Design a protein with these regions (language model features):
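Glycine/serine-rich anion-binding loops at beta->alpha junctions
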Residues: 19, 88-98, 403-405
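Extended amphipathic alpha-helical scaffolds
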Residues: 2-65, 71, 131-371, 375, ...
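Alpha-helical transmembrane segments of multi-pass membrane proteins, especially transporters
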Residues: 96, 100-104, 120-128, 430-438, ...
Length: 545
């Protein structure tokens, strides 16, 4: 046994690469910082846009969630940071850029602490203490508000600042407030999904409107059917209105012409009885999830009904929410109680050739549609992203009734409080708490830099004003401190608390990793000039700017 001393024991396959300790932590931190840096310049009302190129398609946006979603990221730690943005977007719908910037800055500050031989566990503990304190400070500074139209409009406008749609901000803010108020009273975890957005190129932005119902990119199944139905009674059929084909290889042999006629007549009678059952229930509009055969189309047209086939499952559910109809599986069992209602169902020509179906005037609509008009598809896509952000924050304020000032004011107050809190701590955790304060303060610093002001001068001015009884944030026009509440620059409390939570979770998760083992893979084969055993981790492709 003694003879084996000093002999290395190999447990990994040849070609595997292992990095541990500070080397692993530094590389992981570098990857996280690269992600944060890629979207840092998009923060704020004067943030820059990014051009994302995929093949022949280009997307121009400064929406953090969109940028990170479109980036082709391979590094596992970088992917973890992207998950921060996804969690923020899924939970709140806004604040993704803030969360990622704070996460990147927390890791940058942690790197400095690691160089001072502060143990990662101590840093993690300090960050957790600071995050808990920050949540408390944010909650204490929150302002209770009523969900009146003026307040909600301020929230909506703040969420859309810097999205490149300033010319449409007033209209979009009004649409988001109206849509949110229309569905806010209904129960459901993801109630925002009850709002559908339809984009129509052409026309003026002011032509955009809300339909208390649903708009489908569909048209009537037959031109013989009426184009317009008033006082519509709507049936939603999960099945089909056509003769089903047999699943087996069975064949029917007909030897006489009269038998063929009888066979076809029998098929038609089946369809006729189904259409008669629909008519008897009182329906005059039928939406079918599957097909509507030619025979059924003819019978529906004779009855003066409008039929639409191959409606997606998602649209069927939205129709049910909007019209109050129930999804019916057996057409022969339909009753008047299964039907929904709408003041109007109409096929309309949109643009030069496209047609859409408008189901509007639903008396108790639990789903609404926002119809956006714009000069181009790119403008419409950016309008939709801005509208999505504003809808989410408006709905959050309607639920929580709590807001905080914007312009970096909450971060300044949190940073000052954390520095005071750090002075009460005795261990090395105080270093981590101070680092956390610096990381949070990077938000107003970045806002100033992106607005073209000297970030250090702006930060110094904000620090001098913070704690004087008002919520001073950065005035993006002057670079000087300004009362954000008085200026109407406000955000939902939950956007800020979730950003702190998401960023802290991501940073602490990265700091806990002290060993990276990468197995040999074909795609990691050495490149020209690279050592055969230098299997470095994949680089993170960045988007084209």
């Amino acid at each position: 046994m003694a003879g084996l001393s000093g002999v290395p024991i190999i447990i990994l396959k040849e070609g595997s690469k292992r990095e541990s300790g500070k080397d692993a932590q530094r590389k992981n931190i570098l990857a996280a910082k690269a992600v944060a840096e890629s979207i840092r310049t998009t923060l704020g009302p004067k943030g820059m846009d990014k051009m994302l190129i995929a093949g022949e398609e280009a997307t121009i946006t400064n929406d953090g969630a969109t940028i990170l979603r479109e980036m082709d990221i391979e590094h596992p730690v970088a992917k973890m940071i992207v998950e921060v943005a996804k969690a923020q977007d899924d939970e709140i719908g806004d604040g993704t850029t803030t969360a990622v910037i704070i996460a990147g800055k927390l890791l940058e500050k942690a790197e400095g602490l690691l160089d001072q031989d502060v143990h990662p566990t101590v840093i993690v503990q300090g960050y957790k203490q600071a995050a808990a304190r920050a949540q408390k400070v944010l909650s204490e500074m929150a302002v209770d508000v009523s969900a009146d139209e003026a307040t909600l409009s301020k929230i909506a406008r703040t969420a859309m600042l810097g999205k490149g749609i300033e010319m449409a901000m007033d209209k979009l803010a009004a649409l988001s407030v109206e849509a949110a108020q229309a569905i806010a009273g209904f129960e459901g975890k993801d109630i925002e999904e009850n709002i559908k957005t339809v984009m129509i190129p052409g026309g003026r932005i002011d032509d955009s409107s809300i339909i208390y119902g649903i708009v489908l990119e569909k048209e009537r199944t037959s031109l013989e059917m009426p184009r317009k139905i008033e006082n519509a009674k709507i049936m939603l059929l999960e099945g089909t209105l056509e003769i089903k084909k047999l699943d087996t290889d069975a064949k029917v042999t007909i030897t006489e012409a009269k038998n063929l006629s009888s066979f076809k007549e029998g098929e038609e009678n089946v369809i006729k009885s189904q259409v008669d059952a629909i008519a008897a229930a009182g329906a005059n509009v039928v939406f079918c999830e599957k097909g509507i055969g030619v025979t059924a189309q003819n019978y529906l047209a004779r009855q003066g009904m409008l039929g639409v086939r191959r409606v997606s499952r998602e649209d069927m559910k939205m129709l049910a929410l909007a019209t109050g109809a129930r999804l019916v599986g057996d057409v022969m069992a339909v009753t008047a109680k299964d039907l929904g209602s709408a003041a109007l169902v109409e096929e309309r020509k949109v643009g030069k050739e496209k047609k859409m179906l408008f189901i509007e005037g639903c008396p108790q609509a639990k789903a609404v549609t926002i119809v956006l008009h714009g000069v181009s598809e790119q403008v419409l896509e950016e309008m939709e992203r801005a509208l999505d952000d504003s809808l989410n924050v408006v709905l959050d304020v309607i639920r929580s009734r709590k807001i905080v000032p914007g312009g970096g004011a909450p971060e300044m107050i949190v940073a000052e409080n954390l520095r005071q809190y750090a002075s009460t701590l005795e261990g090395r955790e105080q270093l981590a708490v101070r680092a956390f304060a610096d990381a949070v303060e990077s938000i107003p610093l970045t806002l100033a830099e992106n607005s073209g002001f000297d970030p250090l001068d702006s930060l110094a001015a904000l620090r001098a004003k913070t704690g004087q009884g008002k919520a001073f944030g950065l005035d993006m026009a002057t670079g000087q401190p300004s009362d954000m509440l008085a200026a109407g620059i406000v955000e939902p409390l939950k956007v800020k608390t979730q950003a702190i939570k998401s960023a802290t979770e991501a940073a602490t998760m990265v700091l806990r990793v002290d060993d990276v083992i990468a197995a040999k893979r074909e795609e990691l084969a050495p490149k020209p000039g690279q050592s055969p055993h230098d299997y470095t981790m994949p680089q993170m492709p960045m988007p084209h700017y």
